Regions:
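Nucleotide-sugar-dependent
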Residues: 169, 212-218, 223-248, 255-263
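Conserved acidic donor-binding segment of nucleotide-sugar-dependent glycosyltransferases
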Residues: 266-278, 286-292
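N-terminal pre-catalytic "stem/leader" segment of glycosyltransferase-like enzymes
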Residues: 1-62
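Membrane-proximal helix-turn-helix segments that form the acceptor-binding/catalytic region
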Residues: 48-56, 70-78, 98-116
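Carbohydrate-associated surface elements
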Residues: 122, 140
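A short, well-ordered alpha-helix in the C-terminal region of glycosyltransferases
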Residues: 286, 293-308, 314
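Conserved catalytic-core segment of nucleotide-activated headgroup transferases in glycan assembly
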Residues: 12-27, 31, 36, 142-146, ...
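C-terminal alpha-helical cap of glycosyltransferases
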Residues: 311-326
Length: 326
């Protein structure tokens, strides 16, 4: 009889749901499991459905959600095995400041779980303080979706940034070094793959609406990927997905020296880490002047993703955890 896996999240549009659950469903089925997803975003109906389906499942995997104490108690009673999967610093506020409420719910969720799946080493350490049953399962992607042979514009030199309005602040804070880089690189253009534009940022922009079926192609059509971010608990909880996407598309990456980005990027091999406007501008100028370096770094990044952050090797790690519970 196939083991039933119930994945609970705030919705299919969430990147956590897509990258840490839904993309694995074909592999789960091939392995003889029965995966199902349920959206729980408030309301008594969704809550009752979760509890009902939890009773029918062999393993319940909660993605990036915590619950009020009473609901968590009910879920724990209904679930034979409970797994908590998270890839963000959901125990603090989005500006990195502490939150007693978020931390209390995070601690309760961690302690109630049979196993915790953490998206990076920082998150794993935080969870292990409350439950030693932690496995690091990095956020990964299907590298086969990303082509590295897309044509690139000849009349501009494009920096690709991919994100959403919620992460717009990181790009806005990059305006000083974007202007400095534009002074060094003729034709520099910022390609924003998101749901907004950033006029007046000190460099020409090309806004491109984000779509799941076109993001890989749009990335590959740029010259460099960039990943500016702050260095606080919230950003340390990020799992370098944007960096991995750029690498999968064959782009060298320049990133802030912070969080999982600094762990994934191999300095001078797959990209560069920068800490100041001058350093950002210098790294971008160096890559703009050396097509061979861009190609070597892009190829090295692609190999790294295929070896360590692609869907098959990560699924093997994930399955070993679930096999031990189901």
């Amino acid at each position: 009889m196939s083991a039933r896996l119930l994945f609970v999240s705030k919705g299919e549009a969430s990147s956590s749901t897509r990258y840490r659950a839904l993309q694995f469903f074909p592999l789960w089925r091939q392995a003889g499991f029965e995966p199902a997803h349920l959206t729980v975003s408030g309301g008594a109906g969704a809550t009752l459905a979760m509890l009902r389906e939890a009773r029918r499942a062999d393993v319940v995997i909660v993605l990036r959600k915590t619950f009020p104490a009473a609901l968590l108690w009910l879920l724990r009673r209904c679930a034979r095995r409970l797994v908590f999967d998270f890839d963000d610093a959901i125990f603090c506020n989005s500006d990195g400041t502490p939150s007693r409420t978020r931390m209390a719910r995070f601690v309760a969720m961690a302690r109630a779980s049979d196993r915790i799946l953490a998206g990076n080493a920082f998150l794993a350490r935080r969870a292990a303080a409350f439950n030693p049953a932690v496995t690091l399962v990095p956020t990964c992607l299907d590298s086969g979706r990303y082509r590295v042979d897309a044509g690139k514009p000849a009349d501009s030199f494009d920096l690709a940034w991919i994100g959403s309005h919620s992460t717009r602040k990181y790009l806005a804070e990059a305006m000083p070094w974007l202007a400095a880089a534009a002074a060094k690189v003729p034709g520099l253009r910022l390609k924003i793959i998101a749901d907004f534009d950033l006029p007046g940022c000190g460099v020409a922009t090309l806004p491109v609406a984000w779509h799941a079926d076109s993001e890989a192609r749009e990335l590959a059509a740029a010259h460099i990927g960039i990943a500016p971010m702050r260095d606080n608990d919230w950003s340390r909880g990020k799992c370098a997905l944007k960096v991995l996407q750029c690498m999968a598309a064959g782009l060298p990456v320049v990133s802030s020296r912070a969080g999982a980005n600094a762990e994934v990027i191999r300095e001078g091999e797959t990209g560069f880490l920068a800490s100041s406007p001058a350093e950002w501008a210098a790294r971008i100028a160096l890559l703009a002047q050396d097509a061979g370096l861009r190609q070597r770094m892009g190829e090295a990044g692609r190999r790294l993703v295929e070896a360590d952050y692609s869907i098959l090797p990560v699924f093997d790690r994930l399955r070993s955890v679930i096999d031990g519970l189901a």
